Amino acid sequence: GNETKEQLEALALDIVQYFGLGCRSTSKIFVPKGYDLNLIFGALYPYNSLMDSAKYANNYDYNKAVYLMSLFDLLDNGFFMLKEDASYTSPVACLHYEFYEDAQMLEKKLTEDNDLIQCITSNQNTTGHFAFGKAQQPQLWDYADGKNTLAFLNILT
């Protein structure tokens, strides 16, 4: 809730890089209750040229139509949607968000849901969390799903 403009811009990159389809793309954010979601839209705005891609635009139009026909509440800026949703996965051109009131309860939820989460980005210097803008830049030892792929392959030989 106290991110700088630069941190929000880096978060926006984590959201839209690879059209949001990267295995480590940010598909959901947790924000403090009362958070101004327009700050997220502001950080995303430089990526409005995504609509120049026919495939992205088709996904945006399709998902928006599905949401509107289903009478879901959503926030929309003309090229990207924010939807309050408990799911960790979101479709192209959409970011799920969830409000929280207690940071300790949020950490507990993230720990409990660890198997559903590929990676966590945050402005906190917390073990296992990546800085905003670094989700798609893992280190050699940042194995997918925390599983050491090389050790697994060695077992097979």
Model-identified regions with their sequence ranges:
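A short, charged helix-loop
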Residues: 1-7
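NAD(P)-dependent aldehyde/semialdehyde dehydrogenase
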Residues: 9, 15-157
